Amino acid sequence: MIRGRIMRKFLILSMLIFTTLCGCVDFSSSNSNGYYHDSWSYNNYTSFVDTHEHYYGKVVKVVDGDTVYVEVNGELWKIRLLGVDTPEIHKRNNPYEYYLLNGTPITDTKYLKEWGYKAKHFAEKELKNKTVIIVFDNEAPKKDKYGRYLAYIFINNSNNLINFNEELLKYGYARVYISNFELKDEFLNVEREAKENRVGLWNWSNN
């Protein structure tokens, strides 16, 4: 009996210690801008959007996986999704732009083009004829040399803001396009995880 009471007390004490330790763990993450979010794409981006120049518009045309036309206040904006690059479908792909985690380039240009079309179909499914939020980055230029707007596109899914640029990386439709923008480190982390898990186009093998 005495031994049983001691064991029960030990179990209760262990549970209390575990609960206390769990309460001390911070399961959220923060970047240098101070807004908090969970890992991966389903982040709470509300603070990010609110503190950046943004507009609402309707996607009327998808050119390819990373370029869309959005109607904003009666104007038609051509938007190049910031920080990501999907394989080309209108011209030949560069076989030395997409590298696996081990440093091997995806040299099969036919394979890359196939994934370019898959990226376009994904963008059409998720964006076409939908109202989105166009968000400009504080570190990146507003337009590129071709006159296209450089921006993030956010989707409001059940009051949860989803960064579509990041979704392309998460599902292996795109690589990170290296330039100066605020979410670069996060995008690189998402890309790395997709490569580690051989998601999407990263499942290529040259065997």
Curated annotation (Swiss-Prot):
Domain of life: Archaea
UniProt keyword annotations, A-Z: Endonuclease, Hydrolase, Nuclease
Family matches, as Pfam families: SNase (PF00565)
Single annotated GO MF: endonuclease activity
Coiled coil: none
Active site: 80, 88, 148
UniProt family annotation: Belongs to the thermonuclease family.
Annotated protein name in UniProt: Uncharacterized protein MJ1439
Native species: Methanocaldococcus jannaschii (strain ATCC 43067 / DSM 2661 / JAL-1 / JCM 10045 / NBRC 100440) (Methanococcus jannaschii)
Lineage per the UniProt record: Archaea, Methanobacteriati, Methanobacteriota, Methanomada group, Methanococci
